[in-house]
Amino acid sequence: MSEFKIGVMHSNYNLPFDEVVEKASRLGLQGIQLARTRDEFSPTNMPASHRREMLDLLHSNGLVFSAICGEQLYGFTDRERNAQLIENSKRLLDMAKELETNIVTTHIGVIPNDSSCDTYKVMQEACFALAEYADSLGAHFAIETGPEVSSTLRAFLDSLGSKGVAVNLDPANLVMVVGDDPVEAVYNLKDYIVHTHAKDGKNLIKGDVNHLYATAQAEQYHGEYLIEMPLGCGDVNFPKYLAALKDIGYSGFLVIEREVEDFRAEDIAYGAGYLRGLLED
């Protein structure tokens, strides 16, 4: 039996939550990552009674929340805007704990290579605050990989002196955006990985990561600069990647994420089978 658990990003089905739970259960998955936390499932729209109902539904289907998404429209690169974003993130961490997970994943913006620049310092300040709060809850605010190579992210995390800000490792983002090796990333980030996405893809043309990760621009670059693909069809070497995760002692979730419009349900089912096949070898 594999030590990994397989889950799915709930928004990828584009269905009501209860139908997503039913589909995940039928696939024999073990968890769901909750998304749409800026609107339908935001802390302000999720009273305690609703949270309990969602948990009851999950548990009755043998599922748990692997994590929730911290869907910020912006990264933490603007000091004036950060105060509100940090408060929003704290409320998401509170909600995560009530939903019986201790992980909120998000993008924080593109970490500059120059650690002495103002943007780097602004992002550090925000992440110091998030790490302190996460530590107080026994939780993690997990940065999703992709906008920078893993060595840059590792140096940034080391500067915080806390595991309160950790890593959600998305191997496809590393491949598609910055051309980084996911296996190397596993070893670089081994002390911080608390959650992972199972996603695959290819880089087509090197692009400006600041544009690629700008909310208003992201969709238009798919197919021009990068392409997301079903698991096993892109440039992520999943056998080696999973072996590396096992080697560092990771035993958490592999959450299938399929963000394209066509064939999502089919690709999620295929992905679950693909992962199981690798994990049984």
Residue ranges and their predicted role:
Residues F4-H10, I32-L34, F65-G70, V104-T106, ...:
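Hydrophobic faces of well-ordered beta-strands that scaffold small-molecule active sites
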Residues M46-R52, N82-K90, S116-C127, G179-V186, ...:
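Charged helix-capping and loop-helix junction motifs
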Residues C233-D247:
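A short, acidic, amphipathic alpha-helical segment used as a generic capping/interface helix at domain edges
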Residues P16-E19, L57-S60, T77-V167, M176:
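Active-site acidic/histidine proton-transfer and metal-coordination neighborhood
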Residues I6, I68, E125-D235, A272, ...:
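Acidic/histidine-rich catalytic cores of soluble enzymes
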Residues M1-T101, D135, S162, A272-D281:
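N-terminal pre-domain/capping segments
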Residues Y250-L278:
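C-terminal/domain-terminus segments
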Residues M9-Y13, A35-T37, G70-L73, G109-I111, ...:
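Active-site beta-loop-alpha junctions enriched in small/polar residues
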